[in-house]
């Protein structure tokens, strides 16, 4: 049996979560499909040109987010480290992304912030849509991250994928354009 590559694992995981996460976001946005208790009701209302929704999903998510008191992360017992982290939090713009990061967690169960130094070795950090990212953990030690992946559709429909390892990045580009 052929060894499954990290690229194959990433593509499979990212493909698998798209439909489910899109559905969760539609529910949050109030676009839930109408569900009937019987076929008869479905037949009676099939020609109805109206939309009825009661979006309790958004109420639950928003009430949790509204009650959260978001703070800059800190390092317990390390004031200098906490000050540096606070500075990075501000400089990278994560302070402006806090709500979206937590909203992702509340809707999908996960959120991603990708941090990496730029060409000038200055740390950059960005919130990324959970539908576009995957974290793969070691099967024997679930606290150890093996790699992370992000894919996105670039200009012209080309799909790009980056695998993030602790010591390197691997870049992949599709040979042809794909329809999103």
PLM feature segments, named:
Residues 103-180:
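Structured, contiguous alpha/beta core segments that scaffold functional sites
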Residues 1-126, 142-144, 155:
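Extended, helix-rich architectural segments
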């Amino acid at each position: 049996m052929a060894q499954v590559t990290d690229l194959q694992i990433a593509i499979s995981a990212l493909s698998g979560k798209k439909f489910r996460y899109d559905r969760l976001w539609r529910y949050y946005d109030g676009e839930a499909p109408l569900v009937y208790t019987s076929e008869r009701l479905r037949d009676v209302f099939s020609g109805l040109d109206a939309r009825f929704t009661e979006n309790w999903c958004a109420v639950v998510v928003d009430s949790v987010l509204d009650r959260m008191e978001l703070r800059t992360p800190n390092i317990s017992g390390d004031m200098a480290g906490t000050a540096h982290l606070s500075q990075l939090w501000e400089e990278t713009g994560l302070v402006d992304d806090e709500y979206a990061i937590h909203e992702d967690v509340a809707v999908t169960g996960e959120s991603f912030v990708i941090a990496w130094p730029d060409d000038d070795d200055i740390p950059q950090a960005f919130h990324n849509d959970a539908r576009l990212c995957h974290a793969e953990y070691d099967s024997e030690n679930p606290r150890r991250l093996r790699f992370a992946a992000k894919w996105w559709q670039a200009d012209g429909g080309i799909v790009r994928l980056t695998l993030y390892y602790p010591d390197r990045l691997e870049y992949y580009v599709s040979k042809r354009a794909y329809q999103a």
